[in-house]
UniProtKB/Swiss-Prot annotation:
It is found in: Mitochondrion outer membrane. Belongs to the MDM10 family. Its main location: mitochondrion. This is Mitochondrial distribution and morphology protein 10. Component of the ER-mitochondria encounter structure (ERMES) or MDM complex, composed of MMM1, MDM10, MDM12 and MDM34. Associates with the mitochondrial outer membrane sorting assembly machinery SAM(core) complex. The lineage of its organism: Eukaryota, Fungi, Dikarya, Ascomycota, Pezizomycotina. The gene is MDM10. Pfam families: MDM10. GO terms for cellular component: ERMES complex; SAM complex. It is a multi-pass membrane protein.
């Protein structure tokens, strides 16, 4: 589950119309959400509040074995009046990353097209927001000693450019040593057709570059209204993206290079039934280390997702195989309330899961209508969950397992006014030399030689209360 201030930061990106999906850093975001989720390892309590549309706070306390905490503050120049902040109103799918259905590339708001027309400025007061250059400030103080201070500064420099400054400063371990500090500067550029990112870190003077290119029509070359070419245009059914990243540090002589491909279906772009469920394929290569990784993620139904990953190293011949799934659940009362909310919602007429209901044999209740080609991008899938009933999803169960039988299970849901995460990790654990000698003397050495046993790795619960 996302931290409350991370949720607010994503709301800031949505309010300022910044596309977080069009980035090489997000190439494998769906597989990472389904396979690389973390489970709580102890008891953790979070108290959060969006006290004003511009200011949010979070207080965190962790216990069991080690007592620590943090104090976080966030300020934004963009008013987040439409962002739900109470635990009973926040859509759970906004807090729990899962299968993310990205939309087709679109023109950033305020960016003129090739023919000189302005981009999409008809959504809310986007034009006024961009003129004020949206800014976000975020700072977190981690306690107890050694005290660590982290911060983030975001500023929208133009409709296509965003500046990010992140820093981390830790108190010196000894009075005579200097405190450790690092600053990471990022400049992100997004035109819809492609995106680029320039990075510099004061830690070892690291320079980096990331780029992503989307194959297909260029949203900057949209035809004018009334153009006959618009009559024959068809919405995109899939999207192929290619990207790469490179790093270099002249201080430590570190060089990094990777490249990747992503192919994903775009079911939200059309109402015609598909011959397959939404899926996402990725391929990433790291030539210097000889690593290759492929992922396949599938949205089997509106509430069930599956994902798998296979990694291989051509130098060491080591391999990795991971599989995972997630299941969303709703109580009967909330399901009835949500169905009524969908019928009353204008979004019900453009439901992007109609084709999935047909494939599963469910009644197709969404009225059909002809979608005309226009300059607006297809509606984003996560916007449906924002405008639907706040109780559209009461809980979610995530499970992942790898080839070594390391298993992680996570339950996240709503309990009264609290948002709760409970998880457990199981897997092989190394035995101590004393216990191994005892089991060997007793003739209890297992098939694996007694070098490891299978058991609990961690159990934890995290509780979030927000207002």
């Amino acid at each position: 589950m996302l931290d409350f201030l991370d949720y607010i930061q994503f709301a800031f990106s949505d309010a300022s119309k910044w596309n977080r999906d069009n980035s090489y850093s997000q190439l494998t975001m769906t597989a990472n959400a389904l396979l690389d989720f973390s489970t709580p390892e102890r008891l953790k309590v979070n108290l959060s509040s969006l006290s004003t549309p511009h200011f949010a706070t979070t207080y965190t306390l962790g216990t069991v074995g080690l007592i620590d905490g943090s104090i976080s503050y966030l300020f934004t120049t963009v008013p987040l009046r439409d962002t739900p902040s109470r635990g009973t109103l926040i859509p759970l799918r906004k807090l729990v990353p899962g299968y993310r259905q990205i939309s087709a590339p679109s023109l950033p708001p305020g960016l003129p097209t090739v023919d000189g027309r302005d981009g999409d400025l008809a959504i809310g007061d986007t034009q006024g927001i961009l003129k004020k250059k949206p800014t976000l400030l975020h700072a977190t103080l981690h306690l107890p000693p050694p005290t660590t201070l982290t911060g983030l500064f975001l500023r929208r420099l133009s409709p296509t450019t965003q500046l990010s400054l992140a820093f981390c400063s830790s108190r010196a371990s000894t009075p005579k040593s200097a405190p450790q500090a690092a600053l990471v500067t990022q400049i992100l550029h997004d035109t819809g057709k492609y995106s680029s990112e320039f990075l510099f870190s004061t830690d070892n003077a690291l320079f980096g570059f990331k780029g992503l290119w989307n194959f297909g029509p260029d949203p900057r070359k949209q035809n004018q209204q009334g153009d006959p070419a618009r009559e024959s245009c068809r919405p995109l059914l899939s999207l192929l993206s290619a990207g790469a990243e490179a790093y270099y540090s002249p201080v430590s002589s570190v060089v990094g290079l990777s490249t990747g491909l992503r192919f994903t279906t775009l079911p939200a772009a059309t109402e015609s039934p598909h011959f397959t469920f939404p899926y996402t394929l990725t391929l990433t290569l790291t030539p210097l280390t000889g690593s290759m990784s492929t992922t396949y993620s599938l949205l089997a139904s509106p509430n069930v997702s599956f994902s798998s990953r296979f990694g291989f190293n051509v130098y060491s011949w080591e391999s990795e195989m991971v599989a995972g799934c997630e299941l969303w659940r709703r109580s009967s009362n909330n399901r009835l309330h949500d169905d009524k909310s969908q019928r009353d919602s204008p979004l019900f007429a453009v439901d992007d899961l109609t084709w999935a209901r047909r494939k599963m044999g469910l009644p197709d209740t969404a009225p059909s209508r002809n979608r005309e080609c226009d300059d607006l991008p297809p509606p984003r899938r996560d916007n449906y969950h924002h405008q639907r009933s706040p109780h559209a999803s009461d809980s979610v169960i995530k499970v992942r397992v790898d080839q070594s039988w390391n298993i992680r299970a996570l339950w996240e849901g709503r309990v009264k006014e609290l948002l709760v995460s409970a998880g457990v990790a199981l897997g092989p654990t190394p035995r101590s030399s004393l216990s191994y000698a005892s089991s060997s003397a007793a003739g209890g050495v297992g098939a694996a030689g007694g070098l490891s046993s299978y058991g609990w790795k961690s159990v934890g619960v995290s509780v979030l209360y927000s207002s």
